[in-house]
Amino acid sequence: QRQMCIRDSLKTMPRFWTDNGFYIEMLWLLSIGIMLDYEDDLIHGLVQLIKDREAKDYIYDTLIRYRFPDWERTTNQVLYPSPYRIAITVTELAEQDKAEAVKRLEKYLKKEWYRGHSDLSWHDDHKYGINHDGYWCFESGALVKVLGLDDSSLKGLPYYPYDMVHWNDNIK
């Protein structure tokens, strides 16, 4: 059922994706796909949309390379530096010191992620009685998985999707 949602999104996104629209939706879909180990054909469908739109983004590249190691990095920039440039910092830190990368990600989750989305329509939905499914920084969970970080210190932090990252820890 969860993969049906992705398939449905793949059908509708091409009609609505604009140069500045659907960046976050694609980031979320890629991130959730990485965390929940979606089938390659689903991830490939997302990748094809990115290719078709020539969307060059560091986070997209990092996540895609995790599933498809032959993917060539298209850029060392993020399409939306605020708040997403942190992904570059965390990735670079992880190459040298994974514990420092987790600390930086923790700071991002605590102080920067929600505030960095203040210009989006869903920001502060909880204050207006609007039904919503919470605020989730899906890309943080995907980065933890991709970079092989120990996220035990992130468990319970607002916005961090710990259970998604660890959904299959006990399934063998």
Segments the model singles out, each with a brief description of its role:
Residues 2-6:
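Short, small-residue-biased leader/transition segments that mark boundaries at the very start
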